[in-house]
């Protein structure tokens, strides 16, 4: 997990999030995953799986975005220093206690449950989660 503490004017400031980033021109989701994992962690992923797509919406000035959610169970290399925050391997119990976006707990729970591929919509009003829809069914 990445503890976002190094970027200025960061909407994720002091939250724990997964690694990731924006697509570059002509990149597929898995190409973006491999590039971002290498850039942010120094690790080369050797085994991964796409687990779902999360749609983030907001009632504020941010337009929202789509996130392809992957898990990896194989990698090579050593963790390096990240310029966006502090990288740490964390246990599930410890992760549950860390500050993160409210909606992140929903998809983290789905990952821990090894749920099949899912579509999740998360709508925020500022920092507050106001709607969550999982596979077309409103859950919050």
Show where each model-derived region lies.
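N-terminal strand-loop-strand
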Residues: 1-17, 45, 49
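Active-site donor-binding loop signature of nucleotide-sugar glycosyltransferases
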Residues: 4, 20, 72, 92, ...
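A generic structural signal for secondary-structure junctions
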Residues: 7, 112-113
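Short strand->helix junction
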Residues: 8-9, 22-24
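Unchanged
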Residues: 23-46, 56-111, 133-140
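Catalytic phosphate/metal-binding cores of nucleic-acid and nucleotide-processing enzymes, i.e., regions
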Residues: 52
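Charged phosphate-binding loop/patch that engages nucleotide di/tri-phosphates or the phosphate backbone
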Residues: 113-140
């Amino acid at each position: 997990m990445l503890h976002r503490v190094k970027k200025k004017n960061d909407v994720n400031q002091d939250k724990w999030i997964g690694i990731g980033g924006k697509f570059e021109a002509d990149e597929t989701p898995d190409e973006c995953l491999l590039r971002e994992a290498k850039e942010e962690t120094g690790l080369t992923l050797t085994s991964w799986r796409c687990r779902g797509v999360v749609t983030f919406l907001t009632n504020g000035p941010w337009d929202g975005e789509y996130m392809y959610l992957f898990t990896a169970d194989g990698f090579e290399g050593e963790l390096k220093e990240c310029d966006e925050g502090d990288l740490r391997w964390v246990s599930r119990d410890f992760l549950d206690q860390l500050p993160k976006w409210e909606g992140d707990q929903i998809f983290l729970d789905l990952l821990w449950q090894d749920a099949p591929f899912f579509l999740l919509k998360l709508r925020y009003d500022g920092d507050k989660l106001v709607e969550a829809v999982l596979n077309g069914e409103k859950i919050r």
